[in-house]
């Protein structure tokens, strides 16, 4: 530490105690203020030479810091535990908080509170919800009840204020998404030339879906989110759908929510359109799986693609082979035109067997969609179609089908064992199958194995197709870009398994939206920390490390740290913090947490 002297235009000297540190983003040395002392002349009545006095103070502080390791602590061996309390405090969230502060998220919500003229501490509640979503995910009530597990005090927060704050978070969600992007872009060099889109759903532990608000004529005034739909794990609970857009480095860009009974196919373009408008994005190549590869999602994103340098957004979509037309199927399995290239796939070198063509694809686009008489229009678009073959993928598909066939044969022999849900996957290989509409039970009507379908499917084992608007993109680049979709699937897994985004405990549309605002902030901050660590550690390991970085108070001002590992060591290295140090003063921990 040192005494910093700054003089204004009139020559008055202001004093502050500062220390050197290394910026975690730029890695350049910087200074930070430990304590502001004000103008030197305000101390003239106390000291003959205020500057000399405070230089001595700083010198003494440095000496005390050197000798803090030799402090003796008196322990009362008869001291009793306080019932229903824990001395264990988490400090790991501090590394998330540092990014939170770097993005000035605190400034955003303080600005909202000032604008709304509310006495609710929107920023403090938001930070609590975000940090606890990573450290100890749970309902809003559960988060409130366990808020004392964080080192900082959140005791002045009231549970009613937590729920009242949610109404503000949904109101400013769109602005907040823009704020996150604008403040992260210069620090992390956001790559939005390629973006990835996918949808998932989250379930509720409720017995009935929501009912939309209708007017007197039966027109929908307000759609409710919680509806029955195809839940990813085949649960029968009501769900909500979320579409997520991430950048090329898997950092979330934007998201949208829609009712669980709506198709993800029709919600992709509106979410992308909103994101582009909000962020002022220029041309981007949208990558999505084959479930989102529709005529509308081709044409309304890219047009007919006839221009040599099409200024419209591009796409890279997965393409179903088994569900394609006869000409495309025949082209895929025709051995003519295939070439073999050695490529690096992770740590392995593999043979990439592939071929491609530029093809005038005929699609049927919905026009006049917002009228009472929508219709289809036939359009031809230029598209690059690439197909590749993988023996490993062929073996995987054959094995999965064989397992389904075994269940189909068992279903044929014992139809009463199955219903519509339990027969899923196997029923596709059974002829004449039908289900009771009320009970879902299998109706026994001369069930037979569909041998023809099995033979037809097996022709295409190992083949995978990807289509794109980028006519000059190489086959290897197409495959590489498409493989990036795994990062958005991984993001969904993190939100569900690590951040416990589901089941959702709030009920109104506004509170549901706010729940996702805090979850979106949490996963974004987590991804930025992952990038800061050089993408060397998977997110679940980072989360677990942050959760384990705790301390216990052993005297009024001394704490014992309880855990460290290599990930925490690297987190500390970003900020010149030794996470291997066993004992810390309260002031040292406060510096980690920047408060």
Annotated model-derived regions:
Residues 1-123:
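Conserved glycine(s) in the ABC-transporter nucleotide-binding domain "signature"
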Residues 3-9, 13-15, 24-26, 103-595:
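Anion-binding and metal-coordination hotspots
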């Amino acid at each position: 530490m040192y005494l910093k002297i700054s003089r204004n235009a009139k020559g008055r000297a202001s004093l502050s105690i500062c220390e050197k540190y290394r910026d975690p983003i730029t890695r350049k040395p910087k200074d930070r203020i430990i304590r502001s002392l004000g103008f030197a002349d305000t101390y003239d009545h106390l000291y003959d030479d205020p500057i000399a006095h405070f230089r001595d103070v700083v010198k003494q502080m440095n000496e005390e810091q050197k000798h803090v390791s030799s402090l003796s602590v008196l322990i009362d061996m008869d001291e009793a535990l306080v019932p229903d309390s824990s001395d264990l405090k988490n400090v790991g969230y501090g590394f998330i908080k540092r990014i939170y502060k770097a993005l000035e998220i605190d400034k955003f919500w303080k600005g909202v509170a000032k604008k709304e003229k509310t006495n609710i501490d929107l920023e403090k509640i938001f930070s609590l919800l975000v940090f606890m979503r990573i450290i100890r995910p749970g309902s809003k009530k559960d988060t409130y009840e366990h808020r004392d597990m964080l080192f900082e005090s959140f005791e002045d927060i009231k549970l009613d204020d937590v729920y009242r704050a949610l109404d503000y978070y949904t109101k400013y969600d769109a602005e907040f998404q823009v704020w996150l992007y604008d403040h992260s872009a210069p620090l992390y060099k956001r790559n939005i030339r390629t973006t990835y889109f996918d949808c998932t759903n989250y379930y509720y532990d409720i017995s009935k879906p929501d009912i939309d608000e209708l007017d007197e004529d039966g027109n929908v005034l307000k759609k409710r989110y919680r509806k029955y739909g195809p839940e990813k794990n085949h649960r029968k609970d009501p769900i909500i759908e979320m579409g997520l857009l991430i950048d090329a480095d898997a950092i979330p860009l934007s998201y949208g929510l829609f009712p669980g009974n709506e198709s993800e196919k029709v919600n992709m373009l509106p979410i992308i359109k909103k994101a582009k408008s909000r962020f002022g994005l220029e041309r981007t190549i949208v990558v999505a799986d084959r479930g989102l590869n529709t005529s509308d999602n081709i044409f309304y994103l890219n047009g007919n693609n006839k221009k040599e340098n099409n200024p419209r957004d591009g796409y890279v979509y997965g393409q179903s082979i088994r569900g394609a037309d006869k000409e495309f199927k025949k082209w895929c399995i025709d051995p003519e035109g295939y070439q073999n290239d050695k490529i690096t796939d992770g740590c392995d070198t593999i043979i990439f067997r592939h071929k491609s063509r530029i093809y005038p694809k005929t699609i049927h686009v919905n026009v006049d969609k917002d009228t009472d008489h929508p219709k289809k229009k036939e359009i031809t678009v230029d598209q690059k179609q690439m197909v590749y073959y993988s023996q490993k993928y062929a073996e995987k598909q054959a094995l999965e089908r064989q397992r389904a066939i075994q269940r189909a044969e068992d279903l044929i022999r014992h139809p009463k064992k199955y219903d519509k849900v339990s027969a899923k996957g196997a029923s596709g290989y059974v002829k004449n199958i039908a289900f009771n509409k009320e009970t879902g039970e299998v109706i026994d009507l001369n069930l037979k194995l569909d041998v023809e379908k099995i033979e037809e499917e097996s022709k295409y084992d190992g083949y995978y197709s990807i289509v794109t608007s980028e006519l000059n993109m190489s086959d290897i680049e197409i495959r590489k870009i498409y493989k990036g979709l795994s990062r958005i699937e991984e993001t969904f897994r993190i939100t569900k398994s690590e951040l416990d985004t589901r089941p959702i405990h709030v009920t109104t549309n506004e509170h549901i939206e706010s729940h996702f605002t805090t979850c979106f902030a949490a996963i974004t901050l987590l991804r930025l920390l992952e990038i800061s660590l050089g993408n060397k550690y998977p997110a679940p390991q980072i989360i677990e490390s942050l959760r384990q970085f705790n301390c216990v108070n052993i005297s009024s001002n001394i704490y014992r740290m309880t855990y460290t590992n290599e990930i925490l060591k690297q987190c500390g290295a970003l900020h010149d913090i030794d996470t291997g140090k066993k004992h810390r003063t309260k002031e040292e921990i406060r510096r980690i947490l920047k408060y």
